[in-house]
């Protein structure tokens, strides 16, 4: 069910028409060979620009780091490395990387991107790690959630 939800919401981010929902899709892929995880955040560019003035890398990175985080099993927040951002049609794709030598199991996720701006904000986080896929769904006011 969560996979279909993510697919459906992802389709919304692919269209060029005005969007009826405020949605952020985040994909986290653990790369065991490097002991790190690649993070791709897809967000409607106009929604993101309404929150981050100027659109500089430093402004975008500061906002993302304040609204999205990963913490290890002990609660230590993992440093998000900025790899850049680019537009793909109406969508802004933000690329990050995080050291995750122990994998993503039990990692705690905070996803509050744009929740401060839009009451109907829905954030989907899809993580691929250790031969499995897990999907977390966040709405405004949700607490941090752990990956299984």
Predicted regions and their residues:
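Bacterial Sec-dependent signal peptides at the C-terminal "C-region" and cleavage site
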Residues: 2-19
């Amino acid at each position: 069910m969560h996979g279909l939800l993510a697919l459906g919401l992802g389709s919304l981010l692919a269209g060029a028409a005005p969007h009826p929902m405020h949605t952020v899709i985040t994909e986290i892929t653990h790369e065991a060979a490097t002991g790190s995880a690649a993070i791709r955040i897809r967000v409607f560019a106009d929604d993101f620009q309404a929150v981050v003035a100027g659109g500089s890398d430093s402004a975008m990175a500061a906002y993302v780091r304040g609204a999205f985080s990963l913490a290890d099993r002990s609660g230590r927040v993992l440093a998000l490395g900025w790899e850049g951002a680019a537009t793909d049609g109406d969508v802004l794709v933000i690329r990050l990387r995080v050291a995750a030598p122990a994998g993503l199991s039990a990692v705690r996720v905070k996803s509050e991107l744009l929740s401060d701006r839009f009451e109907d904000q829905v954030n989907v986080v899809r993580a691929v790690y250790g031969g499995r896929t897990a999907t977390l769904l966040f709405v405004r006011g949700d607490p941090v959630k752990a990956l299984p």
